């Protein structure tokens, strides 16, 4: 009977160790997935930042060109008078 108890405790111990190891691996996998998601989010933020900057520069250039065109039109109108 004593051998049976020891065997049973040993089997339960091995099962507990196995369960603990699998839980640890599961947490590591989740951490890796979270890290990959964070890296992808950073890439997206960087991309949106570049797009935003390019849009601002394009808007400034368009406004500058429109201002020059308006100034030229006014100068021509004044020059004709």
UniProtKB/Swiss-Prot annotation:
Residues 1-22 form the signal peptide. One of its GO terms (cellular component) is extracellular region. It holds the Pfam family FSAP_sig_propep. Disulfide bonds: none annotated. Residues 30-41 have a biased composition (Acidic residues). InterPro entries: Frog_antimicrobial_propeptide (IPR004275). Expressed by the skin glands. Keywords: Amidation, Amphibian defense peptide, Antimicrobial, Cleavage on pair of basic residues, Immunity, Innate immunity, Secreted, Signal. Residues 22-49 are annotated as: Disordered. Its main location: secreted. It is found in: Secreted. Residues 23-45, 80-81 form a propeptide. GO terms for biological process: innate immune response. The modification Isoleucine amide is found at residue 78. Belongs to the frog skin active peptide (FSAP) family. Dermaseptin subfamily. Antimicrobial peptide. This is Dermaseptin-S6. It comes from Phyllomedusa sauvagei (Sauvage's leaf frog).
